[in-house]
């Protein structure tokens, strides 16, 4: 029994290293060299084919503009404060209940402060009234960083935070900031003046403004929303067109989206109210599958 075990151990040792034939694991040094060389060449060729394929593909892709941009959906409309459950609920006499909303607005508006827009090599004044879209050259063929339009916080009026650091929440008159999500090269097309009668808009018309309106979403909400005040450039209820098109993060890393502030001044207390805000334009679409495409709704409840 012991002899058989010793013989078995000897055969294993001989397989690992055969001193007579100079073999390691059944192969000579030359054999190991050939097989290793084969696999190095084999996997090297595979890696070369893979890298070459990637390089060819990258030559067809622009780092500045998507190849198939016609498949991009219309931009979404979103609100600040950004909340997970799209629900704003607070007590005006309890600062802790609305602290998170206020801090969210403050953080978002940091880049809109005058001190953040001082560099004249990056920012430029584009006027105090809405004007036509501002073209800044071809996206694909012209390199170099493009300038962006400044946006003044005081255009947001009561919701700017300049005079009320609670953005109306302390008084039970909450503000929300509305923005149109960035889409590369997108140029909003406002509705034509003669077609405005099809929209429930109570505002002055301007062909260079993409209008936005907030209303009660359900019939029972409409009488409970109360008065709504809008604050935007030039007193218009929407987004001025000179901030478009957007040229992307590489060409406009400091781009500022135009904003619209909305303040609800007399919401019914102790009632959950659903508010829908909607942008109107010829190339603004809506989808039942995406509730933020061109519109959004938020629940607001002011507790006594």
From Swiss-Prot:
It is a single-pass type II membrane protein. It is found in: Cell membrane; Apical cell membrane; Cell membrane, Sarcolemma. The modification Phosphotyrosine is found at residue 101. Glycans are attached at residues 158, 193, 266. Residues 191-304 are annotated as: immunoglobulin-like. The keyword Nucleotide-binding does not apply. Residues 63-304 are extracellular. Glutathionylated. N-glycosylated. One of its GO terms (molecular function) is ATPase binding. Disulfide bonds join 126-149, 159-175, 214-277. This is the non-catalytic component of the active enzyme, which catalyzes the hydrolysis of ATP coupled with the exchange of Na(+) and K(+) ions across the plasma membrane. The beta subunit regulates, through assembly of alpha/beta heterodimers, the number of sodium pumps transported to the plasma membrane. Involved in cell adhesion and establishing epithelial cell polarity. Belongs to the X(+)/potassium ATPases subunit beta family. This is Sodium/potassium-transporting ATPase subunit beta-1. It comes from Mus musculus (Mouse).
